[in-house]
Amino acid sequence: MKKTLLIAASLSFFSASALATPDCVTGKVEYTKYNDDDTFTVKVGDKELFTNRWNLQSLLLSAQITGMTVTIKTNACHNGGGFSEVIFR
């Protein structure tokens, strides 16, 4: 029973790690803009990415104003790609 539990716990940790969103770009927010399709675009480093997560907008604007460093995490790490996760540093 303990061996089965250990294997199940190991597999769940592995699958959670495999699904983790990779870092795309780290830097300061250069600019932000609202789009006609109700999305919000930010430029960090050499990437211009969008999100439809309204709860991130005020946080990203604050990061831009204060010069905070952010890390955008996404699987679509190309200009015009979308994201839904940000780390504020």
Swiss-Prot record:
UniProt entry tagged with the keyword Signal: yes
Any one GO BP annotation for this protein: symbiont-mediated hemolysis of host erythrocyte
Mutagenesis or variant effect for residue 63 to T: Great decrease in cytotoxicity
Coiled coil (residue ranges): none
Keyword Transmembrane helix: no
Signal sequence, start to end: 1-20
Function summary: The B subunit is responsible for the binding of the holotoxin to specific receptors on the target cell surface, such as globotriaosylceramide (Gb3) in human intestinal microvilli.
Record-stated family: Belongs to the StxB family.
Protein name, per record: Shiga toxin subunit B
Species of provenance: Shigella dysenteriae
Lineage, opening ranks: Bacteria, Pseudomonadati, Pseudomonadota, Gammaproteobacteria, Enterobacterales
UniProt gene name: stxB
